[in-house]
Swiss-Prot record:
Taxonomic lineage: Bacteria, Bacillati, Bacillota, Bacilli, Lactobacillales
An example Gene Ontology CC term for this record: cytosol
Name of the featured protein: Putative pre-16S rRNA nuclease
UniProt-listed HAMAP family: Nuclease_YqgF
GO biological process: rRNA 5'-end processing
Gene3D superfamilies: YqgF/RNase H-like domain
Family to which the UniProt record says this protein belongs: Belongs to the YqgF nuclease family.
């Protein structure tokens, strides 16, 4: 089962993909979106769905640290609903608390990426990888 992991922000969507066995997640790209112009990145996602023969999506749910839901959760669920309607594929959700912070730490400490501009380009993809990998790990059938 091949899944796309998405880290949906207000301006970008980080995209990761699972391998065909659903074991590992790899970063793919960052898609620019503009909600004010109703550009939700569906065209590039459609291309990826076709290219990789995707079976579904995993979206991060940006819950508050105390577990409550805020506006960002509602936005993520609305994006998920849009994906379901557009692609007729299942959408799963995964807690994304701290994924952006963890991505930043990995890029700075582990990869030595101190250039802020370069890091910004990759951080959404890394967050998508963490969201997807967390989901895959929780749902792995050993």
């Amino acid at each position: 089962m091949r899944l796309l992991g998405l880290d949906v922000g207000s301006k970008t969507v980080g995209v990761a993909i699972s391998d065909e066995l659903g074991i590992t997640a790899q970063k793919l790209e960052t898609i620019q979106i503009d909600e004010t112009k109703y550009n939700f990145g569906m065209r590039p996602l459609k291309k990826l769905v076709r290219q990789y023969d995707v079976d579904g999506f995993v979206l991060g749910l940006p819950k508050n640290m105390d577990g409550t839901s805020g506006n960002s959760v509602a936005r993520s669920k609305a994006y998920g609903k849009r994906l379901e309607e557009k692609f007729n594929l299942p959408v799963y959700y995964s807690d994304e608390r701290l994924t952006t912070i963890e991505s930043r730490r990995v890029l700075i400490e582990d990869a030595g990426m101190h250039d802020r501009k370069k890091r910004k380009q990759v951080i959404d993809q890394m967050a998508a990888v963490l969201i997807l990998q967390n989901y895959l790990d929780l749902h792995r059938k050993d």
